């Protein structure tokens, strides 16, 4: 997982055969730094740190060589762009295959991606599925689809998924992998095997990192660039950009001890951002290695909760949290309106993050009222239609303010969703369990010009469709 690379160079030898102009550079490459070389300046002028007596000092130096926040953000951006390009290339292949146009709808494509990714990921105690394991048998009982489904079950079991969750996920994936067109060999090779070969080569290496990204949100967005996700208009499937989910998690004062929930989680983008902030806070505040490891496990297993009613989107949320390694313990496929009181009794939420379906009652404020009614402390950050706060959210907004304080209202750009939805939104920030007094000061901020220039070109990358043209990162940080 780590290596020290030392290069020595020189051009001139003296009469004793010694290099008179030596140059030395050393770089530390490690998994913790996503294999980005970090310069070890202390070894440039002397290699004395390599002596056995000094090795502890060298280890201390290497332990402190970490990526800067700027380097991490650059890696994240590059990874997202590369992932998006690879996904679109695979989807273009599916889109251009005339034989598949009537075989795979958009939901099926989501299931193909998520299923093959689950099958191809490594996990402790289970050998990852290799392309060579798929034999393209022309058999109803033993074919590539059956092999993939079996491997998914083993993978989920190894990740300690409950029996109910395994059954739900394999049921959702079953139809597409049991489809004869998918597993029947053509020229000696099944479509499943061809797609898995490309996903294994192009997609999975990008997912097996310690970056906290909304990976499956990127998959969903890439597919919805081409065709609408089934039911997305009825259920308002619009994913919140990652820079906004991170911004909102910070507005809600998320930290290592927060308990974060989202009752309309989509692909889990808010929970991914919250987890990232929580883990970084733990790393900054906990010195003991064993205590830190235990805290990170607790964050992933006990301090995050999400609910999603749509099966095709829920499975993306579960995969996202598995890729985070593994925060899927408290992910529920259900109607949160039926579940929130039951969950509220078991989960001591202190942070509520939400981008609700705006077609719901009160423009989505019904979700807010239900969630905040179960909380006794903390903060909530809600991305919602701006007019919901000026009458269209009644009676829910009035009820919310009886028990909670509106701290801030932040007007967001009307093209926030880059062409996928054109609606004027605002972020409302609440302090929970403190009734709003009419004399309370509310902070109003206009972020409608946030520094990003957006467009929605189907075949363009995020670099093209979202450009920082006027200090956008600094504005959100401020």
What kind of region is each of these model predictions?
Residues 238-354, 365, 385-386:
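Conserved S-adenosyl-L-methionine
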Residues 96-113, 207-214:
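Structural motif
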Residues 217-243, 249-250:
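Class I SAM-dependent transferase core
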């Amino acid at each position: 997982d780590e290596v020290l690379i030392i290069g020595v160079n020189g051009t001139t030898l003296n009469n004793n055969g010694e290099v008179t102009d030596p140059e030395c550079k050393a770089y530390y490459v490690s998994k913790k730094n996503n294999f980005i070389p970090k310069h070890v300046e202390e070894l440039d002028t002397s290699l004395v740190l390599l002596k056995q007596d000094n090795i502890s000092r060298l280890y201390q130096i290497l332990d402190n060589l970490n990526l800067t926040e700027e380097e991490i953000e650059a890696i994240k951006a590059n990874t997202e762009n590369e992932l998006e390009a690879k996904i679109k290339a695979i989807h273009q292949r599916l889109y251009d295959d005339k034989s598949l146009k009537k075989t795979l709808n958009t939901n099926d494509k989501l299931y193909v991606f998520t299923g093959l990714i689950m099958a191809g990921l490594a996990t402790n105690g289970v050998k990852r599925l290799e392309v060579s394991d798929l034999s393209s048998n022309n058999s109803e009982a033993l074919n590539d689809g059956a092999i993939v489904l079996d491997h998914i079950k083993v993978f989920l079991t190894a990740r300690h998924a409950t029996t109910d969750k395994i059954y739900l996920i394999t049921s959702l994936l079953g139809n597409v992998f049991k489809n004869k067109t998918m597993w029947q060999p053509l020229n000696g090779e099944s479509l499943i095997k061809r797609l898995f070969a490309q996903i294994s080569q192009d997609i999975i290496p990008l997912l097996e990192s310690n970056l906290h990204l909304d990976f499956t949100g990127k998959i969903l967005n890439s597919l919805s660039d081409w065709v609408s996700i089934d039911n997305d208009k009825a259920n308002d499937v619009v994913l919140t950009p990652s820079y906004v989910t991170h911004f909102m998690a910070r507005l809600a004062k998320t930290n290592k001890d927060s308990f974060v929930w989202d009752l309309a989680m989509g692909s889990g983008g808010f929970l991914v951002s919250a987890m990232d902030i929580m883990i970084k806070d733990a790393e900054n505040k906990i010195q003991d290695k064993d205590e830190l490891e235990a805290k990170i496990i607790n964050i992933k297993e006990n301090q995050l909760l999400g609910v999603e009613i749509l099966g095709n989107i829920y499975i993306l949320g579960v995969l996202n949290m598995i890729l985070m390694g593994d925060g899927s313990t408290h992910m529920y496929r259900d109607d949160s309106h039926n579940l929130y009181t039951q969950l509220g009794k078991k989960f001591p939420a202190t942070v509520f993050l939400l981008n609700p379906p705006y077609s719901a009652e009160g423009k989505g404020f019904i979700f807010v009222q239900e969630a905040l009614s179960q909380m006794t402390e903390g903060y909530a950050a809600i991305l919602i239609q701006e007019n919901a706060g000026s009458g269209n959210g009644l009676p829910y907004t009035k009820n919310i303010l009886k028990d909670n304080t509106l701290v801030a209202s932040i007007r967001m750009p009307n093209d926030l969703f880059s062409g996928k939805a054109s609606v004027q939104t605002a972020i409302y920030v609440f302090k929970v369990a403190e009734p709003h007094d009419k004399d309370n000061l509310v902070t109003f901020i206009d972020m409608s010009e946030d520094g990003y220039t957006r467009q929605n070109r189907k075949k363009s990358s995020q670099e093209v469709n979202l450009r920082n043209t006027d200090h956008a990162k600094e504005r959100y940080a401020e």
